[in-house]
């Protein structure tokens, strides 16, 4: 197996994919809100891989190879990313490119 992609590069890649796909997967109001507030409140952060991904993707997720990135807006009062626009499962193996996104639904 190749050396895993760094955490920072994984987050950057996830964010780039999010920006490309957001207009087709989020409500227009959410795209406008995210774009307008990202500079002040936006975040893309790596979190522990959720146990629900196995059911979502149909295979057993290796938590050493895959990462979960959450993208959204941080609550200014408590500095918590609580308005999540997307959860992404992304492979950190450069030879095994994969991502799966769960989008915010109102």
Swiss-Prot record:
InterPro entries: dsDNA_mimic_put, Put_dsDNA_mimic_sf. It comes from the Bacteria. SUPFAM superfamilies: Putative dsDNA mimic (SSF102816). Pfam families: DUF440. Belongs to the putative dsDNA mimic protein family. May act as a double-stranded DNA (dsDNA) mimic. Probably regulates the activity of a dsDNA-binding protein. This is Putative double-stranded DNA mimic protein VC_1208. The lineage of its organism: Bacteria, Pseudomonadati, Pseudomonadota, Gammaproteobacteria, Vibrionales.
